[in-house]
């Protein structure tokens, strides 16, 4: 299963370097999503959160976009986690793959600073010349002090091209 995921991700990365004829996503985009997150160690918990992001094209001749954003969610009703992220998105529209990393913080618990990693696949549909809707499936690894947490997320959101 892991080999299949890596193979699909590699194909999207190769498609990202193909020259584009019409850069419909050449401008900066701003957007956000609502997410449902499940912690692997706490079976049965389904958590909610938000994701705010901006993307910029890396070059005129590739489908790579730089990703900067903030992700936050409530994993168990008591603690809140958030992390800033910097990453890359490879688009072969309507599909794309992404990966990012950043610093995490637990503002309601131990106030620890840790690391966060996020990777996944997404599907985006243009609804106007400036708006597009997207949905993502992601795997997150978040360090909250001494403990690494693994979560899976399903996100649905919208992006606006400036």
Model-derived segments and their meaning:
Residues 102-134:
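A mid-sequence interfacial segment
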Residues 1-27:
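Cleavable N-terminal export/targeting peptides
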Residues 26-28, 42-50, 78-84, 105, ...:
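Residues that define the transmembrane beta-barrel architecture of outer-membrane proteins
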Residues 28-34, 66-70, 86, 97-101, ...:
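Membrane-embedded beta-strand positions of outer-membrane beta-barrel proteins
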Residues 58-66, 94-97, 125-133:
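Repeated loop/turn-to-beta-strand initiation elements of outer-membrane beta-barrel proteins
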Residues 125, 149-162:
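Outer-membrane beta-barrel "beta-signal"
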Residues 34-40, 56, 70-76, 90-94, ...:
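Transmembrane beta-strands of outer-membrane beta-barrel pores
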Residues 21-73, 155-161:
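Short glycine/proline- and aromatic-enriched beta-strand/turn motifs that initiate or cap beta-hairpins
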């Amino acid at each position: 299963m892991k080999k299949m995921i890596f193979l699909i991700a590699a194909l999207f990365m190769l498609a990202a370097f193909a020259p584009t004829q019409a850069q419909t996503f050449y401008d900066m985009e701003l957007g956000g999503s609502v997410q449902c997150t499940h912690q692997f160690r706490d079976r049965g918990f389904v958590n909610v959160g938000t994701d705010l992001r901006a993307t910029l094209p890396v070059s005129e001749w590739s489908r790579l976009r730089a990703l900067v954003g903030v992700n936050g969610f409530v994993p168990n009703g008591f603690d809140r986690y958030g992390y800033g992220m910097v990453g890359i998105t490879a688009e072969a529209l309507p599909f794309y793959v992404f990966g990012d990393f950043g610093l995490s913080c637990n503002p309601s618990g131990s106030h620890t600073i840790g690391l966060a990693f996020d990777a996944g696949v997404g599907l985006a549909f243009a609804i106007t010349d400036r708006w597009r809707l997207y949905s993502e499936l992601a795997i997150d690894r978040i360090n909250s002090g001494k403990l690494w947490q693994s979560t899976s997320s399903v996100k649905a959101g919208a992006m606006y091209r400036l």
